[in-house]
């Protein structure tokens, strides 16, 4: 095996996946940017959740909004529901791991807030439960998935936004997810700050 060739193929495959995704995802990403910006401008907040690498993505996104992305601006209201180990373990222990995000959504979510629900397969039970809780709280949902969207794609309401990566390989989906999150951050900043370029 030639490691250099293998690494080169990884880069090429990643680039091709991203280029193929833009045709499907640019318009819904723009819709998600507008939804999130409208919520933030109306004193709403964004709650984000996911498992494993998607949990890291939820935290990354919340950090970019709370601190800053590439432009100076005031902090924005975003909370990753993946970070409080006492809350996560108490819910998982006393109830069920399926409820680790939904209980937080029911406690923190308000009408007009946005839930960013991340699942590469679209089938994560605790993310599905969080979406159901968000709907109960009259929140908007932006779902970031892959592999056809799974059960999440089937349960979204017409007012939700589905950002589904047209790929089946988890690593490639995660790479497009990160780029998508950066596009969301950039778009929110541009709308809030009136950037025209």
Swiss-Prot record:
Gene Ontology cellular-component terms listed: cytoplasm
Record keywords: Carbohydrate metabolism, Cytoplasm, Isomerase, Metal-binding, Zinc
Pfam family, one: SIS_2
A GO MF term: D-sedoheptulose 7-phosphate isomerase activity
Cofactor dependence: Zn(2+)
Keyword Hydrolase: no
Annotated InterPro entries: GmhA/DiaA, Phosphoheptose_Isoase, SIS_dom, SIS_dom_sf, SIS_GmhA/DiaA_subfam
Keyword GTP-binding: no
Pathway(s) served: Carbohydrate biosynthesis; D-glycero-D-manno-heptose 7-phosphate biosynthesis; D-glycero-alpha-D-manno-heptose 7-phosphate and D-glycero-beta-D-manno-heptose 7-phosphate from sedoheptulose 7-phosphate: step 1/1
UniProt binding sites for Zn(2+): 60, 64, 174, 182
CDD domains given in the database record: SIS_GmhA
Main localization of the protein described in the UniProt heading: cytoplasm
NCBIfam families: PRK13936.1
Matching PANTHER family: DNAA INITIATOR-ASSOCIATING PROTEIN DIAA (PTHR30390:SF6), SEDOHEPTULOSE 7-PHOSPHATE ISOMERASE / DNAA INITIATOR-ASSOCIATING FACTOR FOR REPLICATION INITIATION (PTHR30390)
Quaternary structure and partners: Homotetramer.
Family affiliation: Belongs to the SIS family. GmhA subfamily.
Name of this chain's protein: Phosphoheptose isomerase
Gene name for this UniProt entry: gmhA
């Amino acid at each position: 095996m030639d490691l250099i060739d293998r690494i080169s193929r990884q880069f090429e495959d990643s680039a091709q996946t991203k280029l193929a995704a833009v045709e499907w995802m640019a318009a819904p990403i723009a819709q998600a940017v507008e939804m999130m910006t409208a919520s933030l401008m109306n004193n709403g907040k964004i709650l984000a959740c996911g498992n494993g690498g998607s949990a890291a993505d939820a935290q990354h996104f919340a950090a970019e909004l709370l601190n800053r992305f590439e432009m100076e601006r005031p902090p924005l209201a975003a909370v990753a529901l993946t970070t409080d180990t006492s809350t996560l373990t108490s819910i998982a222990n006393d109830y069920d791991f399926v409820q680790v995000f939904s209980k937080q959504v029911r406690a923190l979510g308000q009408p007009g807030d946005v839930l960013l629900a991340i699942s590469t397969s679209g089938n994560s039970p605790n993310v599905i439960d969080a979406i159901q809780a968000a709907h109960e709280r009259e929140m908007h949902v932006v779902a970031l998935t892959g592999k056809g969207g799974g059960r999440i794609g089937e349960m979204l309401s017409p007012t939700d936004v589905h950002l589904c990566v047209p790929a089946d390989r988890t690593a490639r989906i995660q790479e497009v997810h990160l780029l998508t999150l950066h596009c969301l951050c950039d778009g929110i900043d541009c709308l809030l700050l009136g950037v025209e370029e």
